[in-house]
């Protein structure tokens, strides 16, 4: 009986499932690390990590958000030792203004919640990738933000060579998908809803050899690469050059509104100053002619009445004489 009790306490420390979370954004979002524990030696609380991601999303600084679920992924697949398996992802980390790597999170991140949070806060729509194919992301040219949900196939557990090959292929798939996007402003959130099994490691060992237990320690924990500076805005702020909306109801109503003529529009009056002046003079002339004509009419009526009165007076005098 004591043996079973002992095993019940020991087994959770022998094998455990902790989710890695890697965040990279083209644009700078300040203060993300204030939401989480600064040390990665202990597992992070999923609530604090979710709050950090909400802070990242709330600014809506990206035009596309890639929510990537890699079943079977562990932090061991993302260490500096495995950098050759992720050539594109690492290259993107070098270019990103915001990078956060959390090797161990207590529970999986709720990607469905994040998807809905992006949709409601950034007026986005979702594109799903379920079959490891970039063709599932159709070309688009409008300015609406996108949530790209990528559910990758599980990584091999038994065969190390197959696992390495699968990771490399998935890295290339991410590259191909990003190349299809019309904007370079995007955010990657890589995690696992079904993480692989890892062995617990003593805290002192993590502190002594962080490169073996951190996500790409040579980039993320390098002060030169992970400073809170905008790497992609060194010269001046330039908004992405979006293609115009094609065959869109929004565009129709916007153009219709532009075509509306408002009487009290200052620009309209300024643009048509000569025409308006001419019309005003013509209307004023017609008005003056009408007034003059009216006064002439009144004058004639008055003269006629006076003549009629004078005639009546003459007739009355003649009758008296008779």
Swiss-Prot record:
Glycan attachment points: 45
Location within or outside the cell: Endoplasmic reticulum membrane
Domain of life: Eukaryota
Modification note: N-glycosylated.
GO cellular component terms, A-Z: endoplasmic reticulum; endoplasmic reticulum membrane; membrane; plasma membrane
Major localization class: endoplasmic reticulum
Cytoplasmic side: 296-322
Membrane-side (Lumenal) residue stretches: 17-274
Physiological role: Required for normal beta-1,6-glucan synthesis, for hyphal morphogenesis, adhesion and virulence.
Family membership noted in the UniProt record: Belongs to the BIG1 family.
Identification of the protein by name: Protein BIG1
Taxonomic classification: Eukaryota, Fungi, Dikarya, Ascomycota, Saccharomycotina
